[in-house]
Amino acid sequence: MSESGIKKLSQERTREWLASQEDEELESIAESSVVDSLDYDYTEEEEDADQNTSEEISTMTLGTQIATKKHSIISDTIRDLMNSINSIQTLGNVNISNSTNVHIGNVTNINGNIQIIADGLTQNRRDRRHVSPPRDNAPKTPTHFEDDYQDESEERVRSDVFIRRQKFKIPKELSAIIPRSSWLAQKPMDEPLPLQLPVKYVVILHTATESSEKRAINVRLIRDMQCFHIESRGWNDIAYNFLVGCDGNIYEGRGWKTVGAHTLGYNRISLGISFIGCFMKELPTADALNMCRNLLARGVEDGHISTDYRLICHCQCNSTESPGRRLYEEIQTWPHFYNIEEEEQ
């Protein structure tokens, strides 16, 4: 067959292919348009403001967001945006030969920020990750996303938009414990010893290091401490069960169920909670103190700490200034504080 005949046959096959496509498939071709959102310009001033408030910043990439129907306007806005940029082109004759990575349809570039701020949400964030299957007798709301499950209070919103940053205001009292994986902890050198629960004693210490109200600095301090405890002290892991930062966060050390290496003579019968910093002349921040009290209450509620536990400080058990004179004075005013000296007398 001649070259002109091959070219003509190729054109005919292309026309047949285009004619055979359903509207749905053509729309999917159009939806492959590129939507690019530039990174949000995050300045040091804004970072400092975030550290001094109760805001948590989370990053969402291309994927799925679950929102309540109260905020269904978010999905409508995204859907309108996608519909406006994904208009279907009218295609004429198409001839493709000796080509790779061919794109048919619009290519739309959006140079700008797309930020969604959802406020007024009262449920736990994990509740929003759950999507209930549709009820048999529940009326089905017609949407463009018929495969998504939804109920009376939630709907799943799909889009091809990159949402770089989304801010939620979360009360510090409800903040979860930051797990070891978040501060890139190395694994224990040996198999950890299990702690017999519930524990009778809780020991308060300080790390005798610098303190900071910035999470990034506290993470660095904790990693340095773990490295020092393992390599210089020869211990199995970081000494403490939990650490409290002046940023108002609780950081997981050895956790609830593992024997620590914080207080000689008390490691097997207590939890060690250490404040990050040195508190000889000043107290930790109010957020740090509140979070420590919340951690104690959570330990009792979850069965890790005895209901009649005894709260003691490191300086009462060993010859040390820890947790610092100023913090020691504060701990003496807390419920469950136990005066070992009176018992010995």
Curated annotation (Swiss-Prot):
List all annotated glycosylation positions: N52, N95, N98, N106, N318
Q: Is Secreted among the key words of this record?
A: yes
Residue numbers spanned by region Disordered: 1-38, 124-152
GO molecular function terms attached to this record: peptidoglycan binding; zinc ion binding
InterPro entries given for it? Amidase/PGRP_sf, Amidase_domain, PGRP, PGRP_domain_met/bac
Q: In which tissues is it expressed?
A: Expressed in hemolymph. Localizes at the lumenal surface of the trachea (at protein level).
Report the domain of life of the source organism.
Eukaryota
Recorded hits in PANTHER family, A to Z, give: PEPTIDOGLYCAN RECOGNITION PROTEIN, PEPTIDOGLYCAN-RECOGNITION PROTEIN LC-RELATED
Q: How does it assemble?
A: Monomer. Peptidoglycan binding induces oligomerization.
Q: Return the protein name.
A: Peptidoglycan-recognition protein LE
Q: What is the species of this protein?
A: Drosophila melanogaster (Fruit fly)
Gene symbol of the encoding locus: PGRP-LE
